């Protein structure tokens, strides 16, 4: 019988696209730290020893954008001049202008409308303690472990990718781990056999163990399968903000509306509505009302209330999807202003999301399960 596999990937914070995300979110945080009402849509491009920062920013904050970018690059670990991209020598150009007055008119405090149209998804399931799908949770844990190793091993470099294939049975239950792929940039002085042993024993084995799996049970493990990975980071590939939207969410396990997160202030529903959708889905699962849930929201630009809200429990709900939807409508203010208030989003909290992930991280406000007891009690009264 053919295996039922699902695969998700992740990247480290030194991947070129994630470098761009980190710079954009660092600039967002710098603006919000001084002016919580900053309107920010910051896009970044990085390539060989060059960084372009552009976009629309309306703020009373005084921010040295190049300095913020250099610090973000330095924090990631690009500090070696010979690698073709480093914090001290990278050329940085800025092309920033203010937000369109037409957009601002429909999203100001009096109107509180959405900053754009679009649909956003949030999901949760019982496959992991953090209520995330196992393939993306493992991929994320592996990439975060790689990042830790980069900062403790001078022979490793920040650019890396991970990928995990999980086997499921016909009922959708996890059977085991079929394949793990890890690629990490490194110094030319790191012998390949030593690197592979280091990654197998110091990265893959402990992460699998944390999730209850033995590395010996994995059918296929590929570590730097093409061999040397010395040329990497922005010197190897150009990076752009918002190009890792599947990595940033659920690894393809749940749907995606297409909007990116990084560099956007919370009036942009691409970000804030995706966060509240995750919050609602996670709380439904935490309340025991379903074992797997996807929530969809959709908005029209300048309109405060969502044009649609839909819950899909994949047949696992203890009450109907329509009743689950009704519970959410009664308990959560889904206007942009309401989302911002509930999750307290006008704060400089975004740079860590570009580094360690948006979902499945316990201290994120949208990861809290404070709504679960309320939903559980209300469900008993329906």
Regions of interest found by a model, annotated:
Residues 38-42, 160-166, 219-223, 289-300:
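A short glycine-rich, hydrophobically flanked beta-strand micro-motif that places a catalytic Asp/Glu
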Residues 9-11, 15-20, 113-127, 230-254, ...:
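Conserved phosphate/anionic-ligand binding catalytic regions in large, soluble enzymes, centered on
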Residues 47, 292, 299-382:
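Internal helix-turn-beta structural module
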Residues 41-59, 301-305:
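Short, charge-patterned binding micro-sites
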Residues 1-41, 374:
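N-terminal, positively charged regions that mediate nucleic acid binding
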Residues 7, 67, 74-231, 360-375:
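Glycine-rich, mobile lid/loop segments that gate access to catalytic sites or pores
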Residues 13-32, 127-144, 264-288:
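Alpha-helical support elements that line or immediately flank enzyme active sites
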Residues 191-284:
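Glycine-rich anion/phosphate-binding loop at the beta-strand->alpha-helix junction
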């Amino acid at each position: 019988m053919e295996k039922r596999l699902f695969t998700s990937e992740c990247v480290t914070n030194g991947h070129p696209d994630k470098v761009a995300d980190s710079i954009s979110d660092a600039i967002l945080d710098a603006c919000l730290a001084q002016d919580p009402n900053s309107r920010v849509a910051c896009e970044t491009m990085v390539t060989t020893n060059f960084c372009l920062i552009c976009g629309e920013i309306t703020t009373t904050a005084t921010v040295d954008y190049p300095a913020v970018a250099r610090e973000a690059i330095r924090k990631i670990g690009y500090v070696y001049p010979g690698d073709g991209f480093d914090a001290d020598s990278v050329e940085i150009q800025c092309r920033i202008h203010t937000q369109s007055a037409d957009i601002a008119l429909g999203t100001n405090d009096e109107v509180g409308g959405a900053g754009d149209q679009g649909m956003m998804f949030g999901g949760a399931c019982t496959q992991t303690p953090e209520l995330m799908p196992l393939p993306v949770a493992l991929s994320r844990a592996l990439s975060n472990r790689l990042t830790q190793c980069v900062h403790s091993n001078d022979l490793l470099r920040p650019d890396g990718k991970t990928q995990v294939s999980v086997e499921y049975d016909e009922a959708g239950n996890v059977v085991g781990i079929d394949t793990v792929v890890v690629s990490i940039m490194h110094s030319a002085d790191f012998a390949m056999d030593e690197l592979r042993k280091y990654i197998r024993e110091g990265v893959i084995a402990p992460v699998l163990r944390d999730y209850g799996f033995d590395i010996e049970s994995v059918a296929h493990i590929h570590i730097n399968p093409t061999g040397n990975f010395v040329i990497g980071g922005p010197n190897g590939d150009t990076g752009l903000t918002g190009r890792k939207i599947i990595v940033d969410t659920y690894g393809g396990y749940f749907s995606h509306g297409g909007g990116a997160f990084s560099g956007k202030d919370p009036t942009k529903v691409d970000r804030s509505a995706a966060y509240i959708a995750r919050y609602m889905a996670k709380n439904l699962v935490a309340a025991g009302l379903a074992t797997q849930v996807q929530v969809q929201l959709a908005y029209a630009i300048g309109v405060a209330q969502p044009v649609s809200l839909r819950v899909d429990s994949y047949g696992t709900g203890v009450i109907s999807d329509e009743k689950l939807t009704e519970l959410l409508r009664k308990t959560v203010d889904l206007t942009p202003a309401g989302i911002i208030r509930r999750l307290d989003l006008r704060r400089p909290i975004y740079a860590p999301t570009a580094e360690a992930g948006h979902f499945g991280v316990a201290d994120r406000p949208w990861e809290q399960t404070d709504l679960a007891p309320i939903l559980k009690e209300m469900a008993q009264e329906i």
